[in-house]
Curated annotation (Swiss-Prot):
It comes from Influenza A virus (strain A/Seal/Massachusetts/1/1980 H7N7). Major glycoprotein, comprises over 80% of the envelope proteins present in virus particle. The extent of infection into host organism is determined by HA. Influenza viruses bud from the apical surface of polarized epithelial cells (e.g. bronchial epithelial cells) into lumen of lungs and are therefore usually pneumotropic. The reason is that HA is cleaved by tryptase clara which is restricted to lungs. However, HAs of H5 and H7 pantropic avian viruses subtypes can be cleaved by furin and subtilisin-type enzymes, allowing the virus to grow in other organs than lungs. Homotrimer of disulfide-linked HA1-HA2. The gene is HA. InterPro entries: Capsid_hemagglutn (IPR008980), Hemagglutn_HA1_a/b_dom_sf (IPR013828), Hemagglutn_influenz_A (IPR000149), Hemagglutn_influenz_A/B (IPR001364). Pfam families: Hemagglutinin (PF00509). Changing residue 504 to E: In strain: SC35M mouse-adapted. This is Hemagglutinin. It is a single-pass type I membrane protein. The keyword Transmembrane helix applies.
Amino acid sequence: MNTQILVFIACVLIEAKGDKICLGHHAVANGTKVNTLTERGIEVVNATETVETANIGKICTQGKRPTDLGQCGLLGTLIGPPQCDQFLEFESNLIIERREGNDVCYPGKFTNEESLRQILRGSGGVDKESMGFTYSGIRTNGTTSACRRSGSSFYAEMKWLLSNSDNAAFPQMTKSYRNPRNKPALIVWGIHHSGSTTEQTRLYGSGNKLITVGSSKYQQSFTPSPGARPQVNGQSGRIDFHWLLLDPNDTVTFTFNGAFIAPNRASFFRGESLGVQSDVPLDSNCGGDCFHSGGTIVSSLPFQNINSRTVGKCPRYVKQPSLLLATGMRNVPENPKTRGLFGAIAGFIENGWEGLIDGWYGFRHQNAQGEGTAADYKSTQSAIDQITGKLNRLIDKTNQQFELIDNEFNEIEQQIGNVINWTRDSMTEVWSYNAELLVAMENQHTIDLADSEMNKLYERVRKQLRENAEEDGTGCFEIFHKCDDQCMESIRNNTYDHTQYRAKSLQNRIQIDPVKLSSGYKDIILWFSFGASCFLLLAIAMGLVFICIKNGNMRCTICI
C-alpha cells in the first residue's frame, strides 16, 4: 500500500484591530527656532518677536499738545531773544527742539546748561510773573545790534542796566524778590563781560565790579572779566547766564554795582512734558509715546533696536536685532514613518500631530465606529493661562519712562559728558545681556511647562484606564474592552469609570501575551520564529518520510 503524505505549510499574519486611544501634541511643518538657557536653536510651534525694529520717521502728535520751537532754542524761552518772542509763555506736553534753534542773540552761554535743559523739557511749558524791580539813577534800556527786531533791541525778559551816561559811576544797588507761589520759581540773570576795560568803564563807570546773589540755599559772587575775544554776531563781549530754583516763600537778593543783566520776570513750570531734539516733520495723524531724533517708536514690545537715545515710554534699547520669545511648545514635525495604526504617533514627546490645530494637546482614537481626533482643552488652557501675559511681564520689567541726556556739552561739561556716554554704553551692554537672559529664561520655562502638561495629561489617562488598558510605548493605550465614541469621550473628559469594564477587560487580557516589544524587536522575533518553525516542520516531515521508507510504507523511485 502506497501511502502519500502531502505536507502544506502556510504562514499567515493577521493584524487584529482593537480599540485604542492615543495622546499627542500639536506640531507644524516648519517651526521657529528660539534659544533657552541650556540650548540654542530649539524649534517651537509658536514664537513672538520681542525686539522692535520698525520706526515711524515723523514725530507723532495725535492726542498731544506739541510745541515746535523752530528757530528758538529751549533756553531762549526764559530770556527772550527775538527768535523766541512767540514762546515766552507756552503750555505743552511735547516740546520739539530743532537743530536750527538758538538760545541767544548776544553771544554767551548758560551755566549748567544741560541740567537746565532737562528741567525745561519736563516742565510742561512756562508762565511768568513780574519780579517788580524798579530802578532810578541808571538806564534800563541797553540794546545791541546782535538782537534785532525792527532795530537794535535786547532780550525780552532781561534788562541791560547801564550808567546814567557814558563813563558815569554806577551806584550800588540791592533788589529782592520773594516767590509768592506754592511751586518753585526759576530765576535767570546775566553777567556782562565787556570786550575791553575801556568798554566796561564806558558802560558802568570805573572801578571793580561785583555782583552778589543769595537766597536761603544759594550764595554766589561774580566778577566780570573784560577782555578781547573773537567777534560773534558783531560782538566781542559775552553774557554768562546763571540760574537758580527759588523755593516757595523764599527770597533771592541781588547786590550789584554794574555789569549786571537783571531779570524782568520769574518763570514757573506748568506741568509735565517730554522734550525731543529732532528735525523730522510732525504728524497729527499718528500717535505714540516714545520719541527719538529720527521719529516715533510705536510698539508694545519690551525691546527696540532703533535708537539708544529715546524719550518717553519706550522699549529698552538692546543691541540684538531679534530676540524670539517662545509662546508655544517644542515642535517636532510629524514623521509618517513613525506612525502606528491610523497615524498614531510613536512617542508622544518625540513626535507631533500637524493636524491638531485647535489645541496644544489632544487625542486620537480607533474603535468599531471609526477613527477620530479631538483637542484636550483643559491641558491646553492650563498651558496657555501660564504663558499668556509672558510678553506683558517682560514689558513690565523693562518699560520705564526716562530721558537720556544728549551730548551737547560745553567744554567745562565735557568730562561729565564722557562719563555719561560711557555709562550709557555700559547700560546698553548690560541691558542687551539682561534681555537675552530674560527671554532665554522664559523660553526654558515655556518648553518645560509644555512637556510637563503633556505628561500630566498622559498620567491622567493612565490612572483612569488602570488595568483596563495597556501602554504600548508610543503614547497609545490598547483598550481590553469595546470602547465606543461615548466611552472614548469619557476618557477624554476624565469621567471614565474603570470598574464598569473591569470584568470584560480581565477576560480579554488573559488571552493576550503580556510581553510587549518595540516594533523593531517584533520584526526580528517574527522572522526568527518563522524560520525556526519552518525548519522544525521540515525536520518532522523528513523524519516521517524516513520512517515510512524504512517500514516499507513508502517507496521512493528515482528516475534518470
